[in-house]
Regions:
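Start-of-helix register in tetratricopeptide repeats
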Residues: 111, 141, 145, 175, ...
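Canonical tetratricopeptide repeat
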Residues: 115, 145, 179-182, 212, ...
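Register position in tetratricopeptide repeats
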Residues: 122, 152-153, 186-187, 219-220, ...
């Protein structure tokens, strides 16, 4: 039995009201994505998605998380920060060359791809993280990471494709349904969003599922259903300010 740590940055990041998601509904409060970790195990070959293994020998960045970029990529990142339009293309090409050389040295190891891409997520560089996650199309944690970064960048159709791929790889990894539901919500595909979020709630009973589903129902004009879901969530999460705000705002808009 292999003990692993799941990086909850990716998992928590998929909750609805963050980053590039459109805030057109009644939710004024955002849930913050924090980089925390929890321990689990992978028996019987099941991949949980978003897995990572801490390396205590890795140096930490000034931001307090582990540094997985080789020195050449760190240098290129710094150069690109102040680069003009004339040189940015050349620097990007150099970066891609060095990135591929680095990953080839480790035979495109899926864990190494995840460590590196996840670091760019922590640096809020979703475009770079996405390109690195896409280097691996076989490990669910990287497929899920690609889906989530697509969603954060507002590329919801691409996100849906990748979340669907992750679901086909492991239907029991509930966060893929949440992510796909939110991407569908962003595209106003409300019926599909409801279906995905109901599956997510049935699998996890998680707070963010109730928030997202109530918000979708409200956007559909189904105030009664929205209030019912928010109330169910409040019965389970009595201290939730966002669910209470949702319920109050739905009630003010009248329940048909």
């Amino acid at each position: 039995m292999k003990k692993i740590l799941i990086s909850l940055f990716l998992i928590i990041s998929v909750i609805g009201l963050s980053e590039s998601d459109r805030e057109t509904g009644i939710t004024a409060e955002r849930t913050e994505a924090t980089a925390t970790q929890t321990e689990t195990s992978t028996e019987s070959g099941t991949d949980d998605g978003g897995e990572t293994v801490e390396n205590p020998e890795q140096q930490k960045t000034t931001a307090g998380f582990y540094e997985y970029r080789p020195q050449i990529l760190i240098q290129l990142d710094e150069q690109m920060k102040g680069a003009g339009r004339g040189s940015i293309g050349q620097l990007n090409a150099k970066y891609e060359q060095e990135l591929n050389a680095y990953l080839e040295m480790y035979s495109y190891d899926s864990d190494r791809i995840f460590y590196l891409a996840n670091e760019y997520m922590l640096l809020n560089n979703y475009n770079r993280a996405n390109k690195i996650f896409l280097k691996d199309n076989k490990d669910i944690k990287n497929v899920f990471g690609a889906a989530t970064t697509y969603r954060f960048m507002g590329q919801n159709e691409n996100a849906i494709q990748k979340y669907t791929q992750a679901i086909s790889m492991n239907p029991n990894f509930a966060e893929s349904y949440l992510g796909r539901g939110l991407a569908n919500r962003n595209l106003d595909n409300y019926d599909s969003a409801v279906n995905d979020l109901q599956i997510y709630i049935s699998k996890t009973g998680a707070h963010d599922g109730y928030v997202a589903l109530a918000d979708v129902y409200f956007k559909m004009g189904k105030n009664k259903e929205a209030y019912g879901i928010a109330s169910q969530g409040l019965a389970k999460y009595r201290d939730s300010k966002i669910l209470r705000t949702l319920a109050n705002n739905i009630y003010k808009n009248k329940i048909d």
